[in-house]
Amino acid sequence: MGKVLTMAMPKGRIFEEAAGLLRQAGYRLPEEFEESRKLIIDVPEENLRFILAKPMDVTTYVEHGVADAGIAGKDVMLEEERDVYEVLDLKISKCHLAVAGLPGADWNGVAPRIATKYPNVASSYFREQGEQVEIIKLNGSIELAPLIGLADRIVDIVSTGRTLKENGLVESEHICDITSRFIVNPVSYRMKDDVIDEMAARLARVVEGETAQ
């Protein structure tokens, strides 16, 4: 039996895309893999163990070594700044981080309020712009903040822009593009470099347009 590779995977839409990518790379995952409600899924025939986590927690699991590798959004990596290796851009779950607000709304006072679940990214961005702002951290329904007067603007993930439009908000600034990345724990990479390199190579072939034989 070979070395078992433990992977942290984000629950939700990214998980389904990532599972599809692994299948394309030739990994035999159970048919019910995506529908499973288990938080730990063992795939012994591939020497793989999957830990299903909230997207914002994947980098934490990998940094602390409870997972050897993982798939995480670049947004989470920028926000959390964990000590992990970014091995490969998987080019899935494409979206971008943006500033948005009500159309025609002026900045409020000296330090406008910015609502976001990415306080570190938002602070860094506005600091680079030379703007002093007050950051308000929220965990969800970020679009609500300008509508109820909690914030002047928001910093959030934009995919299709539909949620902004439905709430009467407009995007005013594009911060950066986001995709999901294959990340690795530095110590695990030294111990399991062969299996990790093989997975990275197989995934890279799929990303570059080839399919596993």
Curated annotation (Swiss-Prot):
Pfam families: HisG
Alphabetical UniProt keywords: Amino-acid biosynthesis, ATP-binding, Cytoplasm, Glycosyltransferase, Histidine biosynthesis, Nucleotide-binding, Transferase
EC number(s) recorded for this UniProt protein: 2.4.2.17
GO CC annotations, alphabetized: cytoplasm
Function summary: Catalyzes the condensation of ATP and 5-phosphoribose 1-diphosphate to form N'-(5'-phosphoribosyl)-ATP (PR-ATP). Has a crucial role in the pathway because the rate of histidine biosynthesis seems to be controlled primarily by regulation of HisG enzymatic activity.
Listed PANTHER family: ATP PHOSPHORIBOSYLTRANSFERASE, ATP PHOSPHORIBOSYLTRANSFERASE ATP-PRTASE
Protein name per UniProt: ATP phosphoribosyltransferase
Organism: Bacillus velezensis (strain DSM 23117 / BGSC 10A6 / LMG 26770 / FZB42)
